[in-house]
A protein has these predicted regions:
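Conserved SAM-binding loop of SAM-dependent methyltransferases across substrates and taxa
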Residues: 112-125
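Helix-to-beta-strand junctions that scaffold the AdoMet/dcAdoMet cofactor pocket
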Residues: 123-124, 220-222
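Class I S-adenosyl-L-methionine
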Residues: 172, 225-228, 233-349, 354
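Mobile active-site "lid"/loop adjacent to the S-adenosyl-L-methionine
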Residues: 137, 173-214, 231-238, 263, ...
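S-adenosyl-L-methionine
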Residues: 132-169
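Conserved class I S-adenosyl-L-methionine
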Residues: 102-111, 130
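A short acidic, Gly/Pro-enriched loop at the edge of an enzyme's catalytic core
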Residues: 100-101, 165-178
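Polybasic, low-complexity RNA-engagement segments
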Residues: 1-47, 292-295, 300-457
């Protein structure tokens, strides 16, 4: 491949003799990998049971490198939410955020959902995750991926980050900004990234990233931590971006990432207008380091920073549980029968715990919890999302394995024989992990796996 001329001129000037190293690795085969969803299993369990080659990655304990020609999207474990296809170094920013159960976390540029699913896994169902995506079509992809991964405590929004900052000031312990960028780290994976590259694009992305970073700062609570990342080499979007932000925000300090165990230090010559900026505290992952090209900076807000005034939040009124839902839940998901419900048109929703404290009245909320289902003709019709989130707890289950021929048939949308599940609704699982739900009658399970998700080839 050929680098864009403006990119080549800039990087030759900045890298000198090291440019040849960049060129050599950037023209090699792109790195491939998966991230393991610890809401489903541990990395050790995955490593011990996987049926495809996967080596642990240095970028994150849940990331694995796979063969360049491996495509996980058709694997049953992918359908069951154990895996997210993600080149290994892309897992680093979420890992650096150091999310712990019980925190409130915001991912401001969340689609398609790889890093978001990592944050959700780190929360382990405790605390709250705000997953935002500005582009509506991408927000829908984000919703589908979080549903597949079995995330129960996420509120997904389709908003400008300025609106989030106004509605939810100072409310989050952790904020991730994986900023929209010029994508220079994607050149060897996507030819269109190189074809569309220009200095004007870099300038536009730097301006957009600065705006999002400002809004992220407003969302962060005193003492909270923010990670800013890109998949580009452009100084204006990376070192210079963070240096300028810190110059404007004395309440923030730059955390030293030199001990993170991967990549290389950021470079001061990429922020020449800020001689006091500790570029070496930031982190770069070059193609030679086993990734595609990432930049990361970790910032902490002072504990004594001013806490903004909080808007008054009127808790949403809980929906009265329909008798049909209660009958269904008590039969198949007893622990859910006492959970509060919210109405979402004709659908019923199990709200994300804690979301009643979010000021979302004027925000575009795509999904605020787990879609439970709807009442049709005086019967409760469960949603696919319900089985993906809670299928392992269903009282009526059909257990499959990778080697079971019924697994492939199920993912093609076919009816399968019921070996253990009794008449009525049942969860279908592979190796103990949900693959959706179906309805049993006469020893056969009618397939309710969504048509758009099936392995049809």
């Amino acid at each position: 491949m050929e680098f864009p001329k403006d990119f080549t001129a800039r990087e030759k000037a900045l890298l000198g003799d090291r440019f040849e190293e960049l060129y050599t690795y950037a023209t090699a085969q792109p790195a491939r990998g998966v991230t393991v969803n610890t809401l489903r299993c541990t990395p050790d369990w995955f490593a011990a049971h996987t049926d495809f080659a996967a080596e642990p990655s240095k970028f994150c304990r849940t990331a694995f490198t796979t063969a360049a020609d491996f495509r996980p999207g058709r694997h049953p474990w992918h359908h069951a939410g154990l895996l997210y296809a993600q080149e290994p170094s892309a897992s680093a920013p979420a890992a650096l955020l150091d999310v712990r159960p019980g925190m409130w976390v915001a991912d401001l540029c969340a689609a398609p959902g790889g890093k978001t699913s990592q944050l959700a896994a780190a929360l382990q169902g405790q605390g709250l995750l705000l997953a935002n995506e500005f582009v509506a079509a991408r927000a829908e992809i984000l919703r589908q991926n979080l549903e597949r991964m079995g995330v129960t405590n996420a509120v997904i929004t389709n908003e400008d980050t300025a609106n989030l900052a106004k509605a939810l000031p100072g409310q989050f312990d952790r904020v991730l900004v994986d900023a929209p960028c010029s994508g220079e780290g994607m050149f060897r994976k996507e030819a269109v990234a190189a074809a569309q590259h220009s200095d004007a694009l870099v300038a536009h992305c730097a301006e957009l990233g600065a705006e999002i970073l400002e809004n992220a700062a407003a969302l962060l609570a005193p003492g909270g931590v923010l990670v800013y990342s890109t998949c580009t080499f452009a100084p204006a979007e990376d070192e210079a971006q963070i240096a300028h932000f810190l110059a404007q925000h004395p309440e923030f300090s730059l955390c030293d990432l030199s001990g993170c165990g991967f990549g290389r230090p950021g470079e001061g010559n990429r922020a020449p207008d800020h001689p006091d900026f500790h570029a070496e505290y930031t982190r770069r992952i070059w193609p030679a380091d086993g990734g595609e090209g990432h930049f990361m900076a970790k910032l902490q807000k002072a504990a004594d920073a001013e806490m903004p005034s909080q808007p008054k939040v009127k808790p949403p009124k809980a929906a009265k549980p329909p008798a049909e839902w209660l009958e269904f839940a008590r039969a198949y998901f007893p622990a859910l029968a006492s959970r509060p419900l919210a109405g979402a048109g004709e659908w019923l929703l199990l709200p994300a715990p804690g979301s009643e404290g979010l000021n979302t009245a004027k925000l575009r909320v795509v999904r605020g919890g787990v879609l439970a289902g709807s009442v049709l003709k005086k019967r409760f019709q469960p949603a696919h999302a319900l089985f993906m989130a809670y299928g392992a707890d269903c009282t009526n289950r059909e257990e499959l394995t990778l080697a079971d021929s019924r697994t492939a048939a199920w993912l093609r949308g076919e009816e399968i024989d019921a070996a253990t599940a009794q008449n009525g609704w049942c969860a279908v699982l592979v190796d103990g992990f949900p693959l959706g739900g179906g309805k049993v009658s006469g020893g056969r399970i009618k397939n309710h796996y969504p048509k758009g998700l099936r392995n049809l080839q």
